[in-house]
Structures are given as structure tokens and as C-alpha cells.
Amino acid sequence: MYCQRLALPLTRSLLASRAPLALRMENAVAARMISTTVARKDIDSAAKYIGAGAATVGVAGSGAGIGNVFGALVIGYARNPSLKQQLFSYAILGFALSEAMGLFCLTMGFMILFAL
């Protein structure tokens, strides 16, 4: 909203001229690119960095989930050592699911940074 005030409204005067429609639209796009200010680009890049940072917060949740899984494995093994193999297979499954969600969050952060 604030960035719109910084851009000069040249498109109205270009569209009001009597030039052919294709030429007017081309000039309107060019005028929009010319009137973009440095402040608008800075705001866009700041929003991109904030979004990428917010997307990678999920990696911390993944780390906490992995800690919970292996903490529960140790407690379960201490209570019943005969179920070692079954508990370990469940722990590996929980680790894989938690790690996959963390990798999705990290991938989205990189996509926001480098693909947009």
C-alpha cells in the first residue's frame, strides 16, 4: 500500500493518449518499470527474506520432534528391554516422518529465496 504512493502514476497519461492500443499498453508497462523506486524493491526483498525465515522455523519443530522420538525410545527400552527391535523400528519411522517435515520447511525457504 505504501509502495504504491512512491510510484509515479504515468500509466494514466499514457493510456489517455491517442496512440494505438498495442503501443499504449507497451508504453504503460515500460512506464511502470521506470517509475518503480528503490524503496519498493527494498520492501519486496525484505518481505522475501521474512517469508523465507518464517518458512524455516519448522526445522526447529522437526528437531524437537526427533528429540521426543528418541527420548521416548530410551524410556521405552528402559521399561521393557525385550521389545528393543520393535521400539527401534517405530522410532526410525517417527524420525523419518519428523525429518521429512523439516526438509519440506527448509525446501520451501530455499524456494522463496531463490525461485521468486
From Swiss-Prot:
The record marks E99 as: Reversibly protonated during proton transport. It is a multi-pass membrane protein. One of its GO terms (biological process) is proton motive force-driven ATP synthesis. The modification N6,N6,N6-trimethyllysine is found at K84. GO terms for molecular function: lipid binding; proton transmembrane transporter activity. The keyword Cell inner membrane does not apply. SUPFAM superfamilies: F1F0 ATP synthase subunit C. Residues 1-24 form a transit peptide. Its main location: mitochondrion. Mitochondrial membrane ATP synthase (F(1)F(0) ATP synthase or Complex V) produces ATP from ADP in the presence of a proton gradient across the membrane which is generated by electron transport complexes of the respiratory chain. F-type ATPases consist of two structural domains, F(1) - containing the extramembraneous catalytic core and F(0) - containing the membrane proton channel, linked together by a central stalk and a peripheral stalk. During catalysis, ATP synthesis in the catalytic domain of F(1) is coupled via a rotary mechanism of the central stalk subunits to proton translocation. Derived from a bicistronic mRNA produced by trans-splicing that also produces excitatory amino acid transporter (glt-1). Subunit of the F-type ATPase which has 2 components, CF(1) - the catalytic core - and CF(0) - the membrane proton channel. This is ATP synthase c subunit. It comes from Caenorhabditis elegans.
